[in-house]
Amino acid sequence: MEQRVAITGIGAVSPLGNTALATWAAMCAGTCGIGPITHFDTDAFAVKVAAEVKGFDGNEYFGKRDAKHLDPCVQFAMAASDEAMHDAGFDVEGAIDRERLGVYVGSGVGGMTTLVDNVHTIADRGPRRVSPYMIAMMIPNMASGNIAIRHKAKGPTLPVVTACATSAHAVGEAFRAIKHGYADAILAGGAEAAIIPDAVAGFTSCRALTTNPDPATACRPFDADRDGFVMGEGACVLVLESMEHAQARGAHIYAEVVGYGNTDDAYHITSPDPEAAGIARAISLAVTEGDVKPSEGLYINAHGTSTKLNDSSETAGIKRALGEDAVRAAHVSSTKSMTGHMIGATGAIEVMACAMALEQGVVPPTINYHTPDPACDLDYTPNRAVRADLTWALSTNLGFGGHNAAIALRRYTRS
């Protein structure tokens, strides 16, 4: 028997705040989380701005001894998982069978800070000075591994790595595992901490990042003057739980996950297919599985990276999948205009935005939107949040390698 799947816990560390509620409140207020890069000296760099996490001290949160052995990416993930577990009520002994609790938390690049630091150590001091913790701190599965250890989660584990679609796929695969009975609940999401010289230089070299130095206008998804994305960092972890299990224990339910689409463009390593066939098919798969009725109060949290190619291609894909009439009635926005592009964490934090939007009837805006682009002709909720009677939500994400993910959600109404 297939299970329905609920979202019962949310945790976030983001450029907008170090909790899920702070992040959501900032989204609704149209707050920009982008500012001058402080993690390193940008004098030699064309890129000057990023969406950094602010006020998070790993030494204070974990203690200096433990923090020293955790890459910042993993620190963000573990903090978000703590909040999600507490929010779901799973931090209480006996609340869930730990052999039925899984962890699907990924990262686009993993512990890149650790890798680069140790490369410099080899160059400066020789190979014998490399940390014995380097490998365990660097590999992308360690967010999932450390979360499982921390919360004694002994169920299925699946660290996902699909670039910018990572945590969307993690949420989708967790949904599938619970739907088909492999777990009662799964911590699903992603984390990233790659605002470092090497990553910024690499993304700049492939012409993905904006060189606009003004934080207030640097990230402007769907605007005609957009010219690249802004690097972000942080983590978001959701507790997905079978509806039966959640209702039996009286859990708070934010929304129901009802569909998932996973496709690949098979087109190019970094550029999206201009025909948008892959993302359109992912949306269609999610909508079909969830029996979504797009004309009945739909919010779409678009990938909306603020790059020329993505935003026009994604717009075409949304229209191709849902049809012109349904899309014209839908509310669309890109919360990346506020969070920046959190890479491996972006899918989960955008599913969070969908769940909160459904529960509270508020559509977060696309800020910095001023000049319409004829190729991007939907209602992108410009600059201010709006109230709306929502029944359905879609979160779409695309990653380097042609990876596409779409997650469909439904507003939860206790029957």
Predicted regions and their residues:
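ACP-dependent fatty acid/polyketide chain-elongation machinery
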Residues: 1-66, 244-256, 352-366, 410-415
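Condensing-enzyme catalytic core mediating Claisen C-C bond formation in acyl metabolism
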Residues: 4-8, 31-35, 214-290, 298-299, ...
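Conserved beta-ketoacyl condensing-enzyme motif
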Residues: 7, 20-23, 28-163, 191-200, ...
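A glycine- and small-aliphatic-rich helix-loop capping segment at beta-alpha/alpha-beta transitions
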Residues: 21-26, 112-127, 177-180, 200-213, ...
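Active-site-proximal alpha-helical scaffold in enzymes
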Residues: 77-90, 140-144, 148-192, 230-251, ...
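Phosphate/pyrophosphate-binding loops at sites that engage ATP/ADP/AMP, CoA/4′-phosphopantetheine
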Residues: 84-97, 246-253, 283-299, 321-326
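Glycine-/small-residue-rich "gating" segment that lines the acyl/pantetheine channel
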Residues: 124-131, 169-172, 176, 192-248, ...
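Acyl-CoA/ACP chain-elongation machinery
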Residues: 182-227, 260-274, 304-311, 328-379
